[in-house]
């Protein structure tokens, strides 16, 4: 006896039982240890921060990262699944700042870096318990006991080794560049981090400013263009546009495009220079404003404006101005002049760009080699310094309003507007970023770009477009990586500098630091190692560590080495098992973890860090917006699991485009649909087997061990004679082949759909068409073969699906397994494909008949002809002889499935329909041009016979104004007009028609089918076993009191009703009499325009 199965299973509760089983039996540990001595399969798990709770963004990659290791384990590999925690960086620091009421770096330093860092250490793992609970409940197996933490000394020491290796390869340097900078966090961010925080639409001022011209530099192009009589009028202004008024006090130049046309115009009593293509935008009629009249004086190329000087807007850096000779004692070629910039466009603004080399990458670049210093008069919190005395201590963005008011007062503001544009924000605190000049340590990524591209060429990406698309393009444009952060809680950059002679060294280990300083650092964090100094060998001075800590992305990118404490330990093991076989994360990590892993692996080993990568998309709320706790636009995923179970959620996520790096709009309804449409049917198939096997005393076949190599399958196949059995076993084997191929390619988008399709075939074709074989009372060979076939199918499908839906498959396995089977389905071997089980001919036959049936059902649905209503006939035409052979052979199946009385085959489709045709304008239009209309009129006059001939490959010649045109099937669009009482549908070579004429007898049989369905439903509601016999009471309801049609129908089909419902005694009552029978369970059953009232009781 099998353990009885409740068809109304509570999946969530059942999953809790499975979790207890796994824990009690140490199944996860056994899944690893049982593969000792086998080949290792290496999986890297990217470390999350434990300062926040897991969310849907973690559930998708988490499920993927469970499926592949489970599959590879079942395929015989030893798969360690070591979890890790990202412990350093801004996420932790921001959290502690809020908790301690600290608002700036100054506050932190007053509080004490040592106390601040220790507070970070104490809180960094605060949600570990919740993470473990959530990950475990999702069904994901990971090794928490052997986890790695980026704050542990061994991990941190390996990072120092990585730094020292880059140093020795000449790939580390210190530079002063324009970088994205967070004023709130007071630190630089790397370019790849911009995409993590995202760009948000913000409103900013957009102002046009007047810069009064001076005489040009004499030797410049402008000096030649504007000399003598060509000199500019004294009231000439350059018009420049900016969305960052706060950078104007630091303006040192104006940029123009060399090949852009610029105009001098006279307007409102003054002269202005701006780009010709932008004149319309500034002076044309706009809204209620009238057009502004101006006079065009001349146009010149931007190249001729180079060297034109102008008055500084503000006095702060006027000492840097160029003289007429293009020189300045303090600033080389001098500032406050027009330069050529290849970044200038005429898409917006005036075509003249204000440049502040301390606050713009392009601005900085065009001043390179001019000798003009990079002016950046702001402090660590982006407040103006004493250099900009009028705004000293004011946050730069807060100065916008005051600066604009001043410009207006001084007559320098030409136009003021507002712009909505996309602007980068900090990925941790969501503050708008500032681009500013800042000193930083860099990895010279541009030096190794070829290595990066070569590494990428060796990676199998899923989806594959990531290789040459998002990731490949990002690598092609890769820039040097700013790895230093002006923060506190992180891995200190292991570089010591001598303030006296500038000598600089990089330390690669704690032991090396001890040799150099005499101190061995037990703790490697900033507040410890900053106290360690090194005697300078060059000058005898004292070397101090540089103040910055490392970007936490550098740490996660080093995890392959640091989790092993490489090269200080596990050297041989690491080198034997690198690169990793598999990683997976979301699409955003193409600019994050995937990128940093690739940089460091290519730099250190000339290899990729991983061989295969599945990239998932973003999970959005149902309304398409980002999931937000504040908006409450999604259900807590833990609540989803409580309601539907983890398997349903996993399958919903994996059977979507999110596994193809596309976005997914999450909905509870979608998970519910997976439960109802896939998991419950799967459970019903299993429940059906168990229920009837127990009734008949059937035990698991002794030789049906189906994991790995099938046992006894060929002997069993030789005995089978029912095509349905041979077919479902063949389809099961096809499933093994398809899913194995997809998973071996890491293509989940091709692995999950075949499983979903299989459940439908098993439940709605094999079991439904085999039910009577299980129901019959005699235990003959056919019945036992049906049992063993279904057993093998259920067991093998469970093995195939186990990595995806680990809970339901474990529950089923525990009831189906024999003593020779593995303790857990996840300790079993994945099924090997057995070609001998495949029967392609039989698969073709079933697919053909299923296609015809599906088309017939579609017609029923389209025309509201419910399946329980018998129809006179299905009429079929096929132009494919093989299809016709199969359909003739499977005629009985078609009759049963479509609930028709007969199948009528026709030779030609015109026996079912009349044809009309229209011209295919797409095809004929190109050929006929102006003659098209006349051709269309002729085509519309074609008769049905002519159209039929064309469909069969003939050509019809028509004459249009003396021109002969050959009409073939591709040149016409065919419309089918059904003959009386027929509803038809066509797919390629197959046409299916339903005869919808309903006779009185067909209608009565339809009523009876509805009745049987109603009785079966009532049996379930009464909790009757499938073998229980019943007494049946029935009458017409009050809706159609004492209706003779229903009584007549029942008498006509009484034997059928009793056989189908196990009725041993039936009584026809007058309307209303059922209510007098007391405690009998009753129900109303609709039947066409009529309604039955029925009651049943168990026959004791």
Curated annotation (Swiss-Prot):
Cofactor(s) named in the record: Zn(2+)
Subcellular location, record wording: Cytoplasm
GO annotations of cellular component type: cytoplasm
Catalytic activity: tRNA(Ile) + L-isoleucine + ATP = L-isoleucyl-tRNA(Ile) + AMP + diphosphate
Any one of the GO BP annotations: isoleucyl-tRNA aminoacylation
Motif, 'HIGH' region: chain positions: 48-58
Residue span of motif 'KMSKS' region: 626-630
Record InterPro entries: aa-tRNA-synth_Ia (IPR002300), Anticodon_Ile_ABEc (IPR033709), Ile-tRNA-ligase (IPR002301), Ile-tRNA-ligase_type2 (IPR023586), M/V/L/I-tRNA-synth_anticd-bd (IPR013155), Rossmann-like_a/b/a_fold (IPR014729), tRNAsynth_Ia_anticodon-bd (IPR009080), Val/Leu/Ile-tRNA-synth_edit (IPR009008)
HAMAP family: Ile_tRNA_synth_type2
UniProt subunit comment: Monomer.
Name of this chain's protein: Isoleucine--tRNA ligase
Originating organism: Treponema denticola (strain ATCC 35405 / DSM 14222 / CIP 103919 / JCM 8153 / KCTC 15104)
């Amino acid at each position: 006896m099998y353990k009885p199965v409740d068809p109304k299973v509570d999946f969530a509760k059942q999953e809790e039982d499975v979790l207890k089983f796994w824990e009690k039996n140490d199944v996860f540990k056994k899944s690893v240890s049982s593969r000792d001595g086998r080949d290792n399969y290496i999986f890297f798990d990217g470390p999350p921060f434990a300062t926040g709770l897991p969310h849907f963004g973690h559930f998708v990659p988490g499920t993927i990262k469970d499926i592949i290791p489970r599959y590879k384990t079942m395929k015989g590999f030893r798969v360690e699944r070591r979890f890790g925690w990202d412990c350093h960086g801004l996420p932790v620091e921001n959290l502690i700042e809020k908790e301690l009421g600290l608002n700036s770096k100054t506050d932190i330093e007053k509080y004490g870096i040592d106390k601040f860092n220790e507070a970070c250490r104490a809180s960094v793992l605060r949600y570990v318990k919740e993470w473990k609970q959530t990950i475990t409940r999702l069904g994901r197996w990971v090794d928490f006991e052997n986890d790695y933490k980026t704050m542990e000394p061994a991990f941190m020491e390996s990072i120092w080794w990585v730094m020292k290796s880059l140093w020795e390869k000449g790939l580390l340097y210190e530079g002063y560049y324009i970088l994205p900078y967070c004023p709130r966090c007071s630190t630089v961010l790397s370019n790849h981090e911009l995409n993590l925080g995202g760009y948000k639409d913000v409103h900013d001022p957009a102002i046009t400013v007047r810069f009064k011209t001076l005489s040009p530099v004499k030797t410049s192009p402008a000096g030649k263009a504007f000399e003598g009589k060509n000199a500019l009028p004294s009231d000439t202004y350059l018009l420049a546009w900016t969305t960052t008024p706060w950078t104007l006090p630091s303006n040192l130049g104006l940029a123009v495009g060399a090949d852009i046309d610029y105009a001098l115009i006279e307007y409102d009593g003054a002269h202005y220079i701006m780009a010709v293509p932008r004149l319309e935008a500034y002076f044309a009629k706009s809204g209620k404003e009238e057009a502004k009249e101006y006079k065009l004086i001349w146009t010149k190329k931007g190249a001729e404006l180079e060297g034109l000087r102008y008055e500084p807007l503000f006095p702060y850096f006027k000492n840097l101005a160029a003289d007429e000779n293009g020189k300045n004692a303090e600033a080389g070629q001098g500032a406050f002049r027009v330069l050529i910039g290849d970044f200038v466009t005429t898409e917006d603004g005036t075509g003249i760009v204000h440049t502040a080399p301390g606050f713009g990458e392009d601005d900085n670049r065009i001043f390179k080699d001019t000798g003009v210093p990079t002016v950046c008069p702001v402090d660590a919190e982006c407040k103006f310094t004493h250099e900009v005395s009028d705004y000293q201590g004011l946050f730069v963005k807060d100065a916008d309003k005051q600066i604009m008011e001043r410009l207006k007062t001084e007559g320098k503001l030409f136009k003021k507007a507002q712009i909505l544009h996309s602007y980068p924000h900090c990925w941790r605190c969501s503050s708008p970023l500032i681009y500013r000049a800042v000193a930083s340590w860099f990895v010279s990524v541009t030096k190794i770009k070829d290595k990066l591209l070569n590494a990428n060429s060796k990676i199998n990406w899923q989806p594959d477009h990531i290789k040459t698309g998002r990731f490949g393009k990002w690598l092609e444009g890769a820039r040097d990586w700013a790895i230093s952060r002006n923060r506190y809680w992180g891995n200190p950059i292991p570089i010591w500098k001598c303030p006296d002679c500038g000598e600089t060294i990089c330390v690669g280990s704690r032991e090396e630091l001890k040799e150099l300083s005499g101190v061995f650092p037990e703790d490697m964090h900033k507040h410890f190692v900053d106290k360690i100094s090194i005697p300078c060998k060059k000058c005898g001075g004292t070397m101090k560590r540089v103040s910055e800590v490392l970007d936490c992305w550098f740490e996660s990118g080093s995890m392959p080495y640091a989790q092993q404490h490489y090269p200080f330990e596990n050297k041989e093991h690491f080198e034997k098992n690198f690169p990793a076989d598999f990683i997976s994360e979301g699409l955003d990590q193409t600019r994050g973890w995937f990128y940093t892993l690739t940089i460091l692996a290519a730099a250190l080993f000339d290899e990729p860090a991983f061989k295969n990568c599945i990239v998932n998309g973003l999970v959005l709320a149902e309304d398409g917006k980002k999931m937000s706790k504040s908006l409450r636009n999604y259900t807590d995923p833990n609540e989803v699991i409580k309601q539907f179970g983890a398997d349903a959620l996993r399958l919903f996520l994996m059977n979507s485009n999110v596994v193809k790096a596309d976005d997914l709009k999450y909905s509870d309804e979608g998970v519910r649909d997976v439960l109802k449409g896939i998991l419950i049917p799967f459970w019903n198939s299993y429940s059906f087997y168990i229920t009837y096997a127990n009734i008949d005393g059937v035990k698991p076949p002794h030789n049906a061990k189906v994991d790995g190599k099938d046992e006894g399958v060929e002997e069993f196949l030789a005995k089978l004679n029912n095509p349905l059995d041979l077919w479902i076993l063949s389809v099961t084997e096809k499933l093994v082949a398809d899913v194995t191929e997809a998973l071996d390619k890491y293509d989940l988008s091709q692995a999950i759909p075949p499983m979903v399709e299989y459940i439908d075939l098993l439940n709605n074709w094999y079991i439904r068409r085999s039910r009577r074989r299980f129901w019959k009372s005699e235990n003959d060979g056919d019945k036992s073969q049906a049992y063993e076939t279904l057993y093998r199918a259920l067991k093998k499908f469970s093995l195939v699906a186990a990595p995806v839906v680990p809970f339901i498959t474990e529950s089923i396995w525990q009831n189906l397994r024999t003593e020779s089977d593995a303790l857990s389905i996840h300790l079993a071997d994945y099924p090997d494909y057995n070609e001998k089980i495949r029967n392609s001919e039989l698969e073709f036959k079933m697919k053909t008949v299923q296609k015809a049936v599906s088309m017939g059902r579609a017609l029923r649905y389209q025309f509201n002809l419910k399946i329980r209503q018998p129809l006179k006939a299905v009429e079929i035409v096929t132009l494919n002889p093989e299809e016709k052979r199969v359909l003739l052979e499977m005629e009985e199946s078609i009759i049963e499935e479509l609930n028709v009385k007969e199948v009528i085959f026709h030779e030609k489709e015109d026996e079912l329909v009349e044809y009309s045709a229209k011209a295919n304008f797409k095809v004929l239009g190109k050929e006929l041009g102006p003659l098209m209309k006349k051709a269309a009129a002729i085509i519309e006059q074609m008769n049905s016979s002519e159209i039929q001939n064309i469909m069969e490959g003939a050509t019809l010649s028509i004459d249009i104004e003396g021109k002969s045109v050959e009409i073939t099937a591709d040149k016409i669009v065919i419309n089918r007009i059904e003959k009386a009482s027929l509803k038809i549908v066509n797919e390629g070579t197959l046409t299916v028609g339903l005869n919808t004429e309903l006779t009185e007898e067909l209608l009565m049989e339809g009523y009876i089918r509805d009745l049987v369905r109603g009785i079966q439903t009532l049996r379930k509601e009464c909790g009757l076993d499938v073998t229980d016999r019943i007494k049946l009471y029935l009458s017409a309801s009050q809706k159609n009191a004492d209706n003779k049609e229903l009584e007549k129908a029942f008498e006509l089909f009484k034997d059928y009703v009793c056989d189908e419902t196990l009725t041993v005694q039936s009584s026809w009552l007058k309307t209303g009499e059922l209510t007098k029978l007391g405690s009998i369970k009753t129900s109303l059953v609709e039947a066409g325009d009529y309604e039955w009232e029925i009651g049943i009781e168990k026959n004791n």
